[in-house]
Design a protein with these regions (language model features):
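Sec-dependent N-terminal signal peptides
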Residues: 4-13
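Structural signature of tandem alpha-helical TPR/SEL1-like repeats
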Residues: 21-30, 56-67, 89-101, 123-135, ...
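Terminal, low-structured helical/coil segments at or just beyond the last alpha-helical repeat
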Residues: 22-25, 186, 190-222
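A conserved position within tetratricopeptide repeats
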Residues: 31-36, 69, 103, 137, ...
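Helix-start (N-cap) detector for alpha-helical repeat units in TPR-like alpha-solenoids
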Residues: 42-43, 76-77, 110-111, 144-145, ...
Length: 222
């Protein structure tokens, strides 16, 4: 089943160039010196939090985002990425609060809706997660990610007919996405619809996916 991965790069540009851990640590050292001179600089704090995230220092990043939000309680970048960091640290209630606050200000932001739905799933609030994913599809009917997220949730709930519909919609929007095809095939295999599963995999191969990349699912076919 396809896992919808939430990557902390979707609201503001957080540095597109790859850096080594040493380079990130060096960046932090420089930013700390700059913050000593300009402690009220929101831009510097956001940059330091970015470096903290890239080093997996989520507590430090949360601290920086919290300082930003004390200065600007509607700073969307700080709100969104603090929610992301809380999720990484399994502070799910706090992540939920940040996502909900973010969406109050910016209600049409797909990744924040998906982030909130993910947190609701982690909190075991299945009905609330379903409602949030339904909202995603209504707000973003042209997003394959919205359909895929709902399909993944439905698959977990063993609502296979509903999941198949959503995997089909996701594939309609991204027909060459091999992970979507594999996810649909996985559901068909669970339903013991072997022929349909094989056809789904074969279609993915025709779209250009190497057969070896789908070996795991081909091996499950009877």
């Amino acid at each position: 089943m396809r896992k919808v991965v939430l990557i902390a790069t979707i609201f503001v540009a957080m540095g597109a160039t790859a850096q080594t851990p040493k380079e990130w640590r060096d960046s932090i050292s420089v930013l700390i010196q700059q913050l000593d001179q300009s402690p009220n600089s929101i831009d510097l704090r956001l940059k330091k939090a970015e470096a903290n995230i890239n080093l997996g220092q989520y507590d430090y990043a949360i601290n920086e985002y919290s300082k930003v939000l004390k200065q600007d309680d509607k700073n969307l970048a700080a709100m969104y990425f603090r929610a992301f960091c809380h999720t990484q640290l399994r502070h799910y209630d706090m992540a939920r609060a940040d996502y909900e606050a973010f969406l109050t200000i910016q209600p049409e932001h797909l990744e924040a809706h998906l982030g909130l739905a993910h947190v609701l799933q982690l909190l075991g609030r299945k009905t609330d997660a379903t409602d949030e994913l339904n909202r995603c599809v209504l707000l973003f009917p042209d997003s394959a990610d919205a359909y895929a997220a709902r399909a993944a949730h439905e698959t977990q709930l063993q609502q296979y007919d509903a999941a198949l519909y959503d995997w089909d919609e996701a594939l309609r929007l991204k027909p060459s996405d091999a992970s979507l095809a594999a996810s649909k095939a996985d559901v068909l295999i669970k339903m013991e619809k072997w022929r349909d599963a094989r056809q789904t995999l074969d279609n993915a191969v025709k779209q250009g996916t190497p057969r070896t990349a789908l070996k795991e699912w081909y091996d499950k076919l009877k």
